[in-house]
UniProtKB/Swiss-Prot annotation:
This is Ribosome-binding factor A. Monomer. Binds 30S ribosomal subunits, but not 50S ribosomal subunits or 70S ribosomes. The gene is rbfA. It comes from Shewanella piezotolerans (strain WP3 / JCM 13877). SUPFAM superfamilies: Ribosome-binding factor A, RbfA. It comes from the Bacteria. Residues 118-142 are annotated as: Disordered. HAMAP family: RbfA. GO terms for molecular function: ribosomal small subunit binding. Belongs to the RbfA family. Pfam families: RBFA.
Length: 142
């Protein structure tokens, strides 16, 4: 039976925290800008780590440039994180753009728009139905 929190998962969590701090405080590359580390997936032998990141940018070209800048600085970032963590082997970092946050926000906006449109239609039809009911009452009074 596997442990509830495996060593690789604990290392991935700590690596995510340390990467977030390093990218926020120590990276001076203007191409990268504000980056969020969503998740880190570490291989079983701790030789590789997939770092899932998001940016405020939605333009695919800018996102690709930022990911390439992170990949170019991966060795430097790895050395900074290695100084903060006590590991015998520091995983090689691979940065991957995670579009799930952007897609989630887009879906949430679509749902909100549909709900507001539906409420507007209900109010419009409710007003028309009330006017019809008032008209029916006026005819009954005659």
């Amino acid at each position: 039976m596997a442990k509830e929190f495996s060593r690789t998962r604990r290392i991935a969590q700590q690596l995510q925290q340390e990467l977030a701090v390093v990218l926020q405080r120590d990276m001076k590359d203007p191409r990268i800008g504000f980056v969020t580390v969503n998740d880190v997936d570490v291989s079983r032998d701790l030789s590789y780590a997939k770092v899932f990141v998001t940016f405020f940018e939605e333009d695919e070209k800018l996102v690709q440039e930022k990911v390439e800048a992170l990949d170019a600085a991966a060795g430097y970032i790895r050395s900074l994180v290695a100084g903060r963590m006590k590991l015998r082997v520091m995983p090689e970092l691979r940065f991957i753009y995670d579009s799930s946050l952007v897609e989630g926000m887009r879906m949430s906006n679509l749902v909100s728009r549909v709900i507001s449109d539906d409420e507007a239609k209900q109010q419009e039809h409710g007003t028309v139905e009330n006017a019809k009911q008032d008209g029916d009452k006026a005819e009954d009074d005659k």
